[in-house]
Amino acid sequence: GLADFLNKAVGKVVDFVKS
């Protein structure tokens, strides 16, 4: 659902920022 999409998007952003 939308929540899953947002969760994945946030996870990608967090990984990008942490790297």
Swiss-Prot record:
Q: Where in the cell is it found?
A: Secreted
Asked if the Swiss-Prot or TrEMBL record annotates the protein with the keyword rRNA-binding, the reply is no
Q: Name one GO biological process term.
A: defense response to bacterium
What's this protein's name? Deserticolin-1
Please list the tissues where expression of this protein has been recorded.
Answer: Expressed by the skin glands.
Question: What are the Serine amide sites (modified residues) in this protein?
Answer: S19
Q: Which GO terms describe its cellular component?
A: extracellular region
Q: Where does this protein have coiled-coil stretches? A: none
Going by the UniProt record, its keywords in alphabetical order are: Amidation, Amphibian defense peptide, Antibiotic, Antimicrobial, Secreted
Function of the protein: Has antibacterial activity against the Gram-positive bacteria L.lactis (MIC=25 uM) and S.uberis (MIC=50 uM). Lacks antibacterial activity against the Gram-negative bacteria E.cloacae and E.coli, and against the Gram-positive bacteria B.cereus, E.faecalis, L.innocua, M.luteus, S.aureus and S.epidermidis. Inhibits the formation of NO by neuronal nitric oxide synthase with an IC(50) of 2.4 uM.
UniProt key word Secreted: yes
